[in-house]
Structures are given as structure tokens and as C-alpha cells.
Amino acid sequence: MSNFLPAEEQLALIQRGTHEIISEEDLLKKLKENRPLRIKAGFDPTAPDLHLGHTVLINKLKAFQDLGHEVTFLIGDYTAMIGDPTGKSATRPPLTREQVEANAKTYQEQVFKILDPNKTKVRFNSEWFNQRTAADLIQLASQQTVSRMLERDDFTKRYNNHQPIAIHEFLYPLVQGYDSIALEADVELGGTDQTFNLLMGRTLQGRYGQESQVCITVPILEGLDGVNKMSKSLGNYIGVFDAPGAMYQKVLSMPDTLIERYFELLSFKSLDEIQGLLDEMANGRNPQDLKKILALELVERFHDADAAANAHKGAGNIITEGEIPEGTPEVTISRGEFGGEIFIASIVRLAGLTKNAAQAKDAVSRGAVKVDWQVVDANFSVKENKTYLIQAGKKAIAQVTFTD
């Protein structure tokens, strides 16, 4: 007798937080086979650390894992040395073997903060590509045309703008697609920016005599600026290995407009519980309360319960990055009095972190002022309602909430 939930119930759980399933009919058919499906998601180790944007996809892997399916966390050590052209306006420089191996090791440590290591297969696509010959690669390349590759949005833009496209970049979607053949994947997961690559795998499987995989895309998580996708290079990220206090404060610093989005994509709470919290906020509950609830959940997930309980605290008179000292004052500042935009020197003064305006300006000019642990210069300003942790020097700190 099968231990799987009915296919329709599984589908409903899988649909949560997804952008698109290609196709739901095919997925339902596979689920009705009452067998562990082979679920694949690939990650190119192009940077040493994962952030919460990556975990949206990993959370979906966990959902499949909890339903009893076979999850493969594929580390694209081979494809990382090609460089994924997705969303790029120029050719990405390839990484060295040493960089890839170091990053891959860190990825494994971080992903098991979410996935069960005893139920997760970790594979490297160099396992099969290092065995391929030039003839194999040419045969793979023959499966697609240049015109099909140019249907990809980023390639089209570069072609129309007379920007170079290297031949090896055309190979990337084919190589990623072949990963699905090597793993005989039933389902592949990816971000919405990976749709072209996922569909390539679906197409290639059919041409290589396999049943085509289902492609599931998940949304791209916006960063703390509320505009751009979460990215370490943009400084708008929350790292999986951030210290508890830093993670807690970063969640509190997100714009109110992201609260629903972050709960939907990052929280493991039930949809009913999340909706209840959102209803309370709509009826007047302080948005900061919801941010604290989510912050505590995330700190506990990536650290532990004790870290979550003490995330808002710190020790000693000297401030340690990532630790918010106990008793940190909370200050509210109205932007309306400043025409909607207020610069950092004024913020430091109004928060009581210096005795006067001259000291505030001096602290900023010396690089002694940090916002959410990041040093800022005199051009930093606040134009929206958010909460920041403002630090001036080694001892002065305040949690500042901005209102209209």
C-alpha cells in the first residue's frame, strides 16, 4: 500500500509559492503513479554563499522531500566553468576549478540547513561531462538551432544591440538540459529566469527517448531594497550564514510592502496562519510585529531556538556586528518634516547618537556610521517607511523607524 498522499493533495501542496508548472496535467499524471519522483534542481557554485533568495527554490525541494520524493541537489561544477548567461548583457568570466570546488563545499554545508541530508542526493554534473567526448558535445549541439537559441530574451537583446555572444554561451542551456537526461529527472525546479533552460531539458529528454520532465518555476525574491532581485553584489541580501542578530535586523529592515511576499516565499507557516497575520496587519497591527515573527522563524531555522530567542540582544558595551545590544533604544522619525527625504547626518542627530549636528557630520565623514552593519557616506538618505539599525562609532546604536 502506498504511503503517498493522494495525487491531488500533493499537487495542492506543490502549487504553493510556484510561478508556473509546465504542465500541471503531466505532473498530476506522474504523481498518480504512486512512486518516488526524481526531483532535480541545479545550482552553479559561482559565489561562496547562499542567501534567502536561493532558499525559495530549496524550500520547494523540501516540499517534495516531505512528500516522499527523491531529491537531487545538483551542483553544476562543470557548468559553472562555462558561466550561465541568464540575464547577462555581457559574457561572464569563467571560474577556476579551485573556486568552484571551494564554493561547492560551502553550498553543501548551507543547503542542509533546510534539506534532510539523509534523504538528499548531492551530485556534480562533472560526473558525466568529464566523460563526454567532443563528438558527444557536437551531437548534443545538433539538437538545437541558432534561431531557437536567439528566442531567449537575453540573447535577443544582445544580438539586436550588436553585443557579442560567445559560442560557449549557446552551449549552456544544452548542457543544463543534458543534466536532466543524465539524472532521468521527472521534475526540474528553477527560478522564473531559468524557464528557457528548463524547457530545453524537457525537449532534449524527448529526443533522447526519455519521458519529458515537468518544469516548475518559482518566483525571484526581491532584495531588501524592494526593487531588485536579492543579490550579494547589490548589498540587498540576507545571507544563510549571517549572524543571528544581523539576520534578525535585516528582516526588520525590509519595506512593509515586502511582508506578504516574504511570508509567502520564506515561511513554513500554514497559509491560513499567514493570512491571519496579514489580516491582523490590515486591521491595524504594527507591521513590525509581523517582521519580528518572520525574523524569529528564519533565525531559528538557520541557527537554533536559543539564537532566535536572543537575536535581538547582545553583550558588552562595544557593539559586535550581528548582535543587537539589549536595551537598544527604538526611535521614530517622521520624514514628512524633511520633505519626504532625510539624510544620514540628520538621522544620526535626531536618533540621539551624537550630541549635535557637527558631531553627526564628523562621524559620517570618518566612515563611523553604519546602517544595518554597512558603512554609509553622506549621500545615504531614507525616502520610504522602513526600520534601520543605525550605529555611530563603537557604542552608540539605535533602531530607527521612519514614518510619513
Swiss-Prot record:
NCBIfam families named among the record's database cross-references: tyrS
Name listed for the protein in its UniProt record: Tyrosine--tRNA ligase
Keywords: Aminoacyl-tRNA synthetase, ATP-binding, Cytoplasm, Ligase, Nucleotide-binding, Protein biosynthesis, RNA-binding
Main location class: cytoplasm
Gene this protein is translated from: tyrS
Binding positions (ATP): 232
Motif 'KMSKS' region, residue numbers: 229-233
Purpose: Catalyzes the attachment of tyrosine to tRNA(Tyr) in a two-step reaction: tyrosine is first activated by ATP to form Tyr-AMP and then transferred to the acceptor end of tRNA(Tyr).
Domain annotation S4 RNA-binding: ranges: 342-402
Family annotation (InterPro entries): aa-tRNA-synth_I_CS (IPR001412), aa-tRNA-synth_Ic (IPR002305), Rossmann-like_a/b/a_fold (IPR014729), S4_RNA-bd_sf (IPR036986), Tyr-tRNA-ligase (IPR002307), Tyr-tRNA-ligase_bac-type (IPR024088), Tyr-tRNA-ligase_bac_2 (IPR024108)
Enzyme superclass (EC): ligase
Family under the similarity heading: Belongs to the class-I aminoacyl-tRNA synthetase family. TyrS type 2 subfamily.
GO term, biological process aspect, one: tyrosyl-tRNA aminoacylation
Gene3D superfamilies (UniProt xref): HUPs (3.40.50.620), RNA-binding S4 domain (3.10.290.10), Tyrosyl-Transfer RNA Synthetase (1.10.240.10)
Reactions that this protein is recorded to catalyse: tRNA(Tyr) + L-tyrosine + ATP = L-tyrosyl-tRNA(Tyr) + AMP + diphosphate + H(+)
Localization of this protein: Cytoplasm
